[in-house]
Amino acid sequence: MAFTMLRPMAARVLYPDIGMLSEDEENRSESDTSDQSYGCCEGAEARRKVPRKTGPMVMVKQRQAANARERDRTQSVNTAFTALRTLIPTEPVDRKLSKIETLRLASSYIAHLANVLLLGEGCEDGQPCFSAIYGAKGDLDGRQPRSICTFCLSNQRKGGGRRDLGGNCLKVRGVTPLRVARR
């Protein structure tokens, strides 16, 4: 997946009918003979002219401030991952998930919950992702099996489905063989 960063376009290009400056401001900016100061830029010009101290103590303080900001950011991210881990069902319950596992399971769980919303919890096998993949009749009609969510897969491996699955085995992309009942 490629992402492209686009530079913002000037407002005058996007909205040619709208002027950026009022007529008074345009007249002021066009007059080169004006020696007046409007007060908006005096402080900024004065600040630019003041040389900055770049001594070793200033550099150390800047580095310490940057380190403190990074620690706060890292702590915030870790707190968010901890909160997300508490919302994702895992087996065993006390299993510690890495960050990438947490993100992958969260994505899978969201897909599972979306299937539950679309198909309802009343699926006869308790696994809405199988119904979404193979249709309500359960026949494949020559279709390739697609990936299923981790939660239906886990339920399937535990034998959580209510049907007798017999010996019908299908290979799901990137996953060990699954037993899926055909009607």
UniProtKB/Swiss-Prot annotation:
InterPro entries associated with the record: bHLH_dom, E-box_TF_Regulators, HLH_DNA-bd_sf
Highest taxon, organism lineage: Eukaryota
GO cellular component: nucleus
SMART domains: HLH (SM00353)
One term of GO molecular function: protein dimerization activity
Region (Disordered): 24-46
Pfam families: HLH
UniProt induction comment: Surface ectoderm and neural tube are the sources of inductive signals required for gene expression and for somite formation.
Gene3D superfamilies: Helix-loop-helix DNA-binding domain
Subunit structure: Heterodimer; efficient DNA binding requires dimerization with another bHLH protein.
Function: Early transcription factor that plays a key role in somitogenesis, paraxial mesoderm development and regulation of stem cell pluripotency. Essential for the mesenchymal to epithelial transition associated with somite formation. Required for somite morphogenesis, thereby regulating patterning of the axial skeleton and skeletal muscles. Also plays a key role in regulation of stem cell pluripotency. Promotes pluripotency exit of embryonic stem cells (ESCs) by priming ESCs for differentiation.
Protein name as catalogued: Transcription factor 15
Organism listed in the record: Gallus gallus
